Every structure is written in structure tokens, then in C-alpha cells.
From Swiss-Prot:
Its EC number is 6.3.2.6. Belongs to the SAICAR synthetase family. One of its GO terms (molecular function) is ATP binding. Keywords: ATP-binding, Ligase, Nucleotide-binding, Purine biosynthesis. Pfam families: SAICAR_synt. GO terms for biological process: 'de novo' IMP biosynthetic process. This is Phosphoribosylaminoimidazole-succinocarboxamide synthase. Pathway: Purine metabolism; IMP biosynthesis via de novo pathway; 5-amino-1-(5-phospho-D-ribosyl)imidazole-4-carboxamide from 5-amino-1-(5-phospho-D-ribosyl)imidazole-4-carboxylate: step 1/2. It catalyses: 5-amino-1-(5-phospho-D-ribosyl)imidazole-4-carboxylate + L-aspartate + ATP = (2S)-2-[5-amino-1-(5-phospho-beta-D-ribosyl)imidazole-4-carboxamido]succinate + ADP + phosphate + 2 H(+).
Amino acid sequence: MSLANQVLAVNDDLPIRTHKPVHSGKVRSVYWLTEEDSARLIKEKGYDVAPDAPLAIMVISDRISAFDCIWHGEGGLKGVPGKGAALNAISNHWFKLFKDNGLADSHILDIPHPFVWIVQKAKPVKIEAICRKYITGSMWRAYANGEREFCGIQLPEGLEKDKALPNLLMTPSTKGILKGIPGVPEADDVNITRQNIVDNYEAFNFSSAEDIAQYEKLLKEGFNVISQALEGIDQIFVDTKFEFGYVHDAAGNEKLIYMDEVGTPDSSRIWDAKEYQAGNIVENSKEGFRQFLLNHFPDPDILLNKERMPEREALARDNDLPVESLMDISRTYIGIAEKITGKPITLSENPKAEIIEILSKEYGLID
């Protein structure tokens, strides 16, 4: 079986019974189940949700996204072998640890296959909830350019690249393009302040102003749980992005939950602690792939400058990356997933066929 065949690159064409268009994101696709199938599975599987709660099948792919573009390799390699299974395994591990530590639930109800989650439909909070323990990435670039205010937070003089911040900082940005919010540009992934959120909490999809403090509490607590666990395997949790949303429990009560993925190499920076102590930055995250791209192309400004998005999209579309660059990130993702979970990540010979068989035989969702 070739590498290209082991990669699940297209994940929005599965014959799952649905009555709505499939939502296809950069990495995951979402299939909204019919009311009948949702109600049947809730009853058959005993999910702890309201009997009429809408459910969805969420299928991850092995696609690799960076700088808001999807990249591919030579020889028809459309993704990173093992990436999807590694990401899901890591998120599953952290969500369980959150629950064990008395934090909030997630949207995941069932895990039929390493690439598949059955989830409860949530009302998303329209914020990328970012938390930073070290100054690096976009925050460092802004600081190096002389900026001393970041997301409304005053930064002290004398900070050094890749060093620990004086405090754990929450630096939110917008999720999607939000229109009509005073002081917030109508663009994707724009940095915002806490005051922006407080003044316009309904526009960011919070049910109440009090929930802002709850989201901040869950963000910090979740960050600290993962950070402490990673310390035990000689890794540093540098920064991360969480997402939150609202669901209703079986009694009909609304609750704020974690959603999407948490603590993965896609949504976080994770550094090797021993290498860091020796003065080296060794990435166990997608940041290594981002750095490869910045070094691979002669004009890295195309990747960093949002005004040059058409050029960037053409760069991703027209360039076959070396296979070894994708295999490097494969080894990184599988390696950190196995360290975190303590379990092997096995590559499927034909993930799409496996998913269809399981969803047909065990869930009755394939026509």
C-alpha cells in the first residue's frame, strides 16, 4: 500500500446519511445526522444528552494546513501519514484528563474509529481562546517591532525571544469574520482585547457576561492540566488555542464546554524540555512545518503578509513539497502522540473503507 493511499485527504465524500450539506473545514468535515438517526443513537448508545439533541459525525483528515493554506507533497501525497489519528488520540487523552480533573465536558459523545468522533451540536463561542506561557511566534514578532500592548495587555520591557512570560497570558482573537463590533476589524483571526469581549459579549456568542470569567477559568485550568502532564514527559507547553461552545445536557440545562481539539501539535506549540535547557528549540508541533515553509520559499513575506493571500494560495496550489518534509511532520505528530498517550499510533491501510464499515455495521448510518 503506497503512502498516498494510507492518507485520508478527502473526508467530505463519505456516504453517511445526512439531510444537510457536509461542512468541510481545513482539517475536519462535519456530517449533520437526521433527527431520526440522532434520536435513535441517543437511545441505543445511551448518550447523556437530551433525547432530541442534534448529533453529527466529525471526520478528521490527514491534510496539513499552515498559513491558512492546504499543502501537498510530491507523488500525489495529499497529506501527512498518521496525522489525523495522532491529533484525535491526543485530544481524546486531554479531554479525559480534563474530566478526571473536574473541568468541563467536551462535545464528543463517542469514538467509533481513530478518525471519527460522534459529537453533540454546540453553539460556538466566536473566539479563538489563546493562552501563552512563552513569548514566541506572532507575539514575539510584534514585540520585536516595538509593540508593547498585545490584546490590550501591557508587556514589560526586556522580554527575550522564546523565554517564559512573567505570567500566563490570555490573548484572544476572533473566530471567523465578525461584523459590526465596535473596535474589531472585519477580518478573520484578528487580535481582540478582554474589554472588546465584555462590551460585546452577545456578538461573540456568550449567553451571559458572567460566562466570560468561566471561559477564562476553563482556559487557564485546561492549560495548566496539560502543562503539568507534559512536564512529566519532558515537554514544554508553550502556547495553545482552545475553542468553547454551549450545549444542553439531558435535563435541558445549558453548559459551557470545550470543543474542537485541545493540546494538539496543530493547535499548540510544544517544545522538548531537555533541548530547551540546552539552548535549543525543538518543536513537537506544526511550528516545525511552518518554519520549513518559511525557509523553503525565497520570499517568506508571502506566507506572513495577509495582504498577499492570492500569492500564498497559488504557492500552496502549485508547489509539490518534498515527501521528506511531510514525513518529518508525520514522525513529529506520531512521536508526540505516543509520548502523550502512552499508546502506539497505527497507520490504517485504508481508513475510508474502515470508517464506512464501522458506521454501517455498528451505527446504521450508511445507506
